């Protein structure tokens, strides 16, 4: 039992246990719920990785009848805007643009030439670059239009995009004034611009804790660019390799997610 002054401040009275004695004595009220502030989560920034498609000696790439395989997801580890800074990246968009023209060795031939490109996803890179023969079934080696992913490896390789670039040789080199009068009726298109922009790729790559961005750094999920030209099939062109020089520049738009 406790004692307290009454409301008039005269004397003291007895109070029972549990009885309140404040301003809100006898009032029934509800406890106010605490309001939580919603803090928006900032999504990871979109990184842009740009590079020129060149050989190790800084010369332009020459694509022939023998298909070549190049790694697109080659993001080095670092803190810059074009680096990966986590153990996982998602490639959303890919841009390739530049100019294609006939090589000097193939320019003397007359006829159409087609250049093929594929974007191929590899779910299990095995820390080594595959050959085109490991990916495609090739009924005709010189005709890329007949190539399809091998049935035994369909769970590993997926063709994300495929496109072609068309050229026409008129018997003379690019920029040459010399004309073969036998074929002066041929409308040449031996140099063309090639631009492609792909969205919605969503290629997820898991990385090891190494920094150079090569195929050996990838645990899962790599993206390749495979290129080849269509070869000759009859006559003098049956054993001819049509070579196309590609002066390309690439841009990869990706996000770095996951843990550091």
UniProtKB/Swiss-Prot annotation:
Query: Per the UniProt entry, what are the Gene Ontology biological process annotations, in alphabetical order?
Result: symbiont entry into host cell; viral penetration into host nucleus
Q: Does the keyword Glycoprotein apply?
A: no
Where can the motif Bipartite nuclear localization signal be found?
10-36
Recorded hits in InterPro entries, A to Z, give: Gemcoat_MSV (IPR000143), GV_A/BR1_coat (IPR000263), Viral_coat (IPR029053)
Q: Where is this region: Disordered?
A: 1-23
Q: Which UniProt keywords apply?
A: Capsid protein, DNA-binding, Host nucleus, T=1 icosahedral capsid protein, Viral penetration into host nucleus, Virion, Virus entry into host cell
Q: Do the record's keywords include Disulfide bond?
A: no
What is the protein's quaternary organization? Homomultimer. Interacts with the movement protein. Binds to single-stranded and double-stranded viral DNA.
Query: What is the protein name stated in its UniProt record?
Result: Capsid protein
């Amino acid at each position: 039992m406790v004692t307290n002054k009454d409301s008039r401040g005269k004397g003291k009275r007895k109070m029972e246990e549990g009885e309140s004695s404040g301003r809100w004595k006898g009032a029934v009220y509800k406890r106010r719920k605490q309001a939580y502030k919603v803090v928006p989560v900032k999504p990871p920034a979109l990184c842009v990785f740009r590079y020129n498609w060149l050989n190790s000696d800084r010369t332009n790439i020459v694509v022939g009848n023998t298909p070549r395989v190049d790694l697109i997801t080659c993001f080095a580890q670092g803190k810059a805007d074009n680096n990966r800074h986590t153990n996982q990246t998602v490639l959303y968009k890919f841009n390739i643009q530049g100019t294609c023209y006939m090589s000097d060795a193939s320019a003397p031939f007359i006829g159409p030439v087609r250049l093929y490109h594929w974007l191929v996803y590899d779910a299990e890179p095995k820390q080594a670059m595959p050959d085109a023969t490991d990916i495609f079934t090739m009924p005709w080696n010189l005709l890329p239009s007949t190539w399809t992913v091998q049935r035994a490896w369909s769970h590993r390789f997926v063709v994300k995009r495929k496109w072609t670039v068309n050229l026409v040789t008129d018997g003379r080199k690019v920029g040459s004034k010399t004309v073969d009068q036998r074929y002066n009726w041929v409308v040449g298109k031996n140099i063309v611009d090639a631009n492609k922009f792909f969205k919605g790729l969503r290629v997820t790559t898991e990385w090891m804790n190494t920094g150079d961005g090569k195929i050996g750094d990838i645990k899962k999920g790599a993206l390749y660019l495979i290129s080849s030209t269509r070869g000759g099939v009859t006559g003098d062109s049956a054993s001819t390799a049509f070579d196309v020089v590609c002066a390309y520049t690439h841009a990869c738009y990706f996000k770095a997610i996951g843990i550091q």
